[in-house]
């Protein structure tokens, strides 16, 4: 990992609580400790770490504790994002998401490129290939322009 660490590469990690019980309620028993250990390894390897937090009924009353925790391990407030629980994937609760209510935040994972990190399901996949990135960015721009012109979300197939 140290060989690829640099100022232009930020690794985002999901952390939903400053305490195991807040994070593990949705992520599974024992995942908080593994996640925090992974964050420390990334930091020691020279990576800038960004946290993505999903606000859930289990952690919503304890988000300030999470902020205190991430500051204590050297993660700045500007590198912490809190998003609402999305009714996507296996989640039976949360808000319904789609292109109409999500500002694009291009997300790359091993499955390809997606419109937003809250929506990495097939219907929000921009490209199955994560390289090169430029064609996917152009597709998102085209979709945004169409949404602006029509005032809605036209049916588009990205993949």
Describe the predicted segments one by one.
Residues 20-22, 58-61, 115:
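Short catalytic/ligand-binding loop motif for oxyanion handling, primarily in non-cytosolic enzymes
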Residues 14-18, 54-56, 83-88, 120:
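Active-site beta-loop-alpha junctions enriched in small/polar residues
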Residues 23-24, 62-63, 92-93:
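Short, well-ordered secondary-structure micro-motifs
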Residues 1-3, 65-67, 94-95:
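Short low-complexity, flexible loop/linker segments enriched in glycine and/or proline
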Residues 61-82:
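Short, electropositive alpha-helical surface patch
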Residues 1-55:
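Radical SAM/AdoMet-radical enzyme domain recognition
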Residues 39, 70-74, 115:
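Hydrophobic, Leu/Ile/Phe/Ala-enriched alpha-helical segments that form helix-helix packing faces
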Residues 85-159:
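Accessory C-terminal segments flanking Radical SAM cores
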């Amino acid at each position: 990992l140290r060989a690829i660490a640099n100022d232009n590469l930020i690794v985002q990690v999901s952390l939903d609580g400053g305490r195991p019980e807040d994070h593990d309620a949705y992520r599974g028993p024992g995942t908080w400790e593994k996640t925090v250990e992974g964050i420390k390894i990334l930091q020691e390897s020279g990576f800038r770490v960004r946290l993505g937090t999903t606000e859930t009924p289990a952690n919503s009353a304890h988000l300030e504790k999470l902020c205190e925790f991430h500051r204590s391990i050297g993660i700045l407030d500007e590198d912490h994002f809190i998003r609402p629980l999305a009714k996507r994937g296996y989640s039976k609760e949360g808000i319904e998401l789609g292109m109409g209510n999500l500002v694009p935040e291009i997300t790359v994972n091993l499955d390809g490129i997606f419109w937003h990190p809250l929506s990495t399901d097939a219907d929000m996949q921009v490209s199955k290939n994560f390289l090169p990135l430029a064609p996917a960015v152009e597709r998102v721009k085209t979709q945004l322009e169409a949404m602006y012109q029509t005032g809605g979300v036209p049916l588009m197939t990205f993949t």
